[in-house]
């Protein structure tokens, strides 16, 4: 039972934390775990209770708790959630609520294309000078597409038409 709870603990410890090694959980993820696993019901256990218990079990100047401290916190929350049961039964009840749960991502916004966005981003529909900025595949040409570069090679610095003299005088 504790191993399943430990797996759930690690899944929530890593959630949203790029630098987390999943050995310790932050207060934010601890609250999310309690909310997503229905330990926090809003009546017997509130978000305030969860924050107080987290602060009680963590070290004085620490910001995270490890799995050992997490079990102590769950024991305290279990006694509040399951009144009338002894601490071990309450802990087992909390672990049963945690079984197989993952961090929920409800309400997370996804990118959508609204209205004329596809018209503006489709390079095949470009006209005029903007059309010349992209090749057939839609990839940008870079500086060649933005600026007209002239060929400055010639006999002297002021001569701009290399190879045109012979064509004129024939």
Curated annotation (Swiss-Prot):
Keywords: Cell projection, Cilium, Cytoplasm, Differentiation, Flagellum, Spermatogenesis
GO biological process, one term: microtubule polymerization
Disruption phenotype: Male subfertility with a significantly decreased sperm count and motility. Sperm shows increased irregular mitochondria lacking lamellar cristae, abnormal expression of electron transfer chain molecules, lower ATP levels, decreased mitochondrial membrane potential and increased apoptotic index.
Xref: Pfam families: p25-alpha
Molecular function per GO: tubulin binding
Region (Disordered): 105-170
Record keyword Cytoplasm present: yes
Residue ranges the record marks as coiled coil: none
Biased composition (Basic and acidic residues): 129-149
The family this protein is said to belong to: Belongs to the TPPP family.
Designated name of the protein: Tubulin polymerization-promoting protein family member 2
Organism: Mus musculus
Gene name as annotated: Tppp2
